[in-house]
Design a protein with these regions (language model features):
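Alpha-helical metal-binding/catalytic segments enriched in His/Glu/Asp
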Residues: 72-73
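Extended beta-strand/beta-hairpin segments
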Residues: 2-67, 78-161
Length: 161
């Protein structure tokens, strides 16, 4: 079966043409125990992630969750800004997640900071890209607890210099 056969046809917003139509409606992965509390995760496309609760040989599941939300929002924001004809020369997002101290120790809040530079960037464009990601497109964000507070700030580097 080809990749095309695995996908459902659906309407894609113009700002997302180029990557959202490549999303599978069902994702599969495999997690294999290695030793102690170390596991190897493998995606359906063969990418691997090592998990280690002791942080000696891999990351924790909560670290990858924080990276996943940062990655999902960043992919959306950069793609939407490019569709708005912005030329991004650098982009970095830092993420800080605050967790509940008692089990199940879920994330209560996530603070994200975007540092971006390039041509054609304006606060209005970045605000719009962030809003589209959070309100409509970021599947990781929309898969998490409804009471998770996600705060996104940004700095356009070199603006006004």
């Amino acid at each position: 079966m080809s990749r095309t056969d695995d996908r459902k046809d659906h309407d894609i917003q113009p700002e997302l043409v180029g990557y959202k139509e490549e999303i599978f409606p069902v994702n599969k992965s495999r997690l294999t125990w290695q030793r102690d509390l170390c596991f190897l995760g493998t995606t359906q496309r063969g990418y691997e992630v090592e998990f280690d609760v002791k942080y000696e040989e891999g990351c924790s599941p909560t670290e990858t969750l924080l990276l996943s939300i940062a990655g999902c929002i960043s992919i959306d924001v950069v793609h939407i800004l490019q569709k708005m004809r912005c030329e991004i020369t650098s982009y970095e997002m830092t993420a800080e997640g605050t967790r509940q101290l008692t089990p199940p120790q879920y994330y209560k809040s996530v603070d994200l900071m975007i540092h971006v530079s390039g041509k054609g960037l304006t606060p209005a464009k970045i605000d719009r890209a962030i809003a589209l990601s959070l309100n409509k497109y970021c599947s990781v964000y929309h898969s998490l607890r409804k009471d998770l507070a996600v705060n996104v700030k940004y700095e356009i580097e070199g603006l006004g210099s």
